[in-house]
């Protein structure tokens, strides 16, 4: 399938024309271009647009039948729902803040606490004193994290091993809810260095911004990269629709796909790069959207019902985001992997039953349908977003280093302090394309 401007800024437009022509060639023919870009998510689209602006010819391929990667605004329930990325994190320096304005998509200040929250334990309300202890526990957890860096890295579980009970309790929802992984697996040093700052939310969907941003980028969808051969002076990408030859490649596929060796490399990647991939992993943060008619169960728009204790801490129900008749359930770690294996019907039914335990049988009566976004079972992602394993806080920076001036990796996994975000993915795609352009210029 091909797409030029139908789905979901050039400084030298004349020089960009060869890029448009090259990218439009059928993949079954051998393409001779400056760079082949693998993956049309935020990083790949940013790389392609930067290549256009720099006068670098390119071919952009994408295995899915759409662009956007792990940004996905679903409209099947009658309203826009982000099944993937939701927040424009560190919005004061995130490129998507400006891009949203450029493509005409509204953003608003907001975060997950903007509508308030109620805390539960296995569906039962948590007493006020316990809830207060949980909040103070989060403060204690952040204080402990400040003393950790790459030289003394530990997991969240190890960090709080001798801490007060409320701090121990706070570590579980932070790891499972924010990273999407079990606390014993996540590097504190890596997570603690990520950018902080104001968030913005997108009523029409983050995915809508990315769709519009990529609307004019030539891309071949439904094309699977199988092998990247970098044994010669350039690269040869073997796909299910023929080979693509280029002077360099930008690889933007998620870490989950790289670790599963869905894309192979010939020769094998250098040890430093291979170790970097090994040092990263994918969390399983996922979502389920539930549509209701009429009853709001006494919850205000944007309120969160948070499961802090009990068997499954770290999951929450986002009630009526943007005052719409939808509840979005957020859940991660091994619990998410378990639920995602149920498939859409089973996963939706499970979360509806959990909500019924909190708000009562009225939810069952008002329910009108649901959608499941189980990223750990998505073959093109195999997870929600990346995290560093304990002792591997330097893996992201190592992965970003070019290989033999022919291979560049880009995406949220190698975005340093901007990792785990769409903004970080964009920055790395842009940086990779600029780096290649600089190397290709006559000296």
Predicted regions: what is each one?
Residues 3-7, 13-443:
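FAD-dinucleotide binding site
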């Amino acid at each position: 399938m091909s797409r030029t401007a139908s789905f979901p800024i050039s400084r030298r437009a004349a020089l960009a024309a060869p890029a448009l022509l090259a990218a439009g060639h059928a993949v079954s023919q051998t393409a001779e271009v400056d760079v082949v870009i693998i993956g049309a998510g935020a990083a790949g689209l940013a790389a392609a647009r930067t290549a256009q602006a720099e006068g670098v010819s390119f071919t952009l391929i994408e295995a899915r039948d759409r662009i956007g990667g792990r940004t996905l605004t679903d409209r099947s329930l009658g309203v826009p729902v982000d099944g993937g990325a939701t927040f424009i994190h560190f919005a004061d320096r995130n490129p998507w803040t400006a891009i949203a304005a450029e493509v005409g998509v509204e953003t608003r200040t907001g975060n997950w606490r903007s509508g308030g929250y109620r805390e539960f334990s296995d569906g039962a309300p948590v007493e006020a004193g316990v809830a207060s202890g949980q909040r103070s526990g989060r403060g204690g957890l952040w204080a402990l994290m400040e003393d950790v860096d790459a030289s003394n890295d530990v997991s969240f579980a190890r960090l709080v091993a001798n801490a007060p009970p409320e701090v121990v309790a706070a570590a579980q929802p932070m790891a499972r809810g924010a990273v999407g992984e079990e606390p014993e697996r996540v590097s504190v040093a890596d997570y603690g260095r990520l950018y902080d700052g104001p968030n913005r939310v997108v009523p029409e969907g983050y995915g809508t911004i990315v769709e519009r941003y990529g609307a004019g980028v030539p891309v071949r969808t439904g094309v699977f990269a199988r092998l990247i051969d970098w044994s010669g002076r350039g690269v040869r990408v073997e796909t299910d629709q023929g080979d693509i030859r280029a002077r360099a490649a930008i690889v933007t596929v998620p870490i989950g796909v790289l670790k599963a060796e869905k894309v192979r490399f010939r020769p094998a990647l250098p040890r430093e790069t291979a170790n970097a991939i090994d040092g990263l992993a994918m969390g399983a943060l996922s979502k389920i959207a539930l549509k209701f008619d009429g009853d709001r169960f006494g919850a205000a728009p944007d309120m969160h019902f948070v499961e802090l204790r009990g068997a499954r801490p770290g999951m929450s129900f986002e009630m009526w985001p943007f005052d719409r008749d939808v509840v979005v359930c957020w859940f991660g770690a091994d619990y998410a992997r378990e639920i995602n294996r149920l498939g859409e019907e089973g996963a939706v039914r499970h979360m509806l039953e959990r909500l019924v335990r909190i708000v009562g049988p009225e939810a069952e009566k008002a329910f009108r349908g649901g959608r499941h976004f189980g990223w750990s079972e998505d073959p093109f992602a195999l997870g929600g977003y990346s995290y560093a394993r304990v002792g591997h806080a330097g893996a992201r920076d190592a992965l970003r280093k070019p290989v033999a001036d022919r291979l560049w990796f880009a995406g949220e996994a190698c975005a340093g302090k901007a990792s785990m975000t769409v903004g970080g993915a964009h920055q790395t795609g842009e940086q990779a394309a600029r780096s290649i352009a600089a190397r290709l210029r006559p000296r």
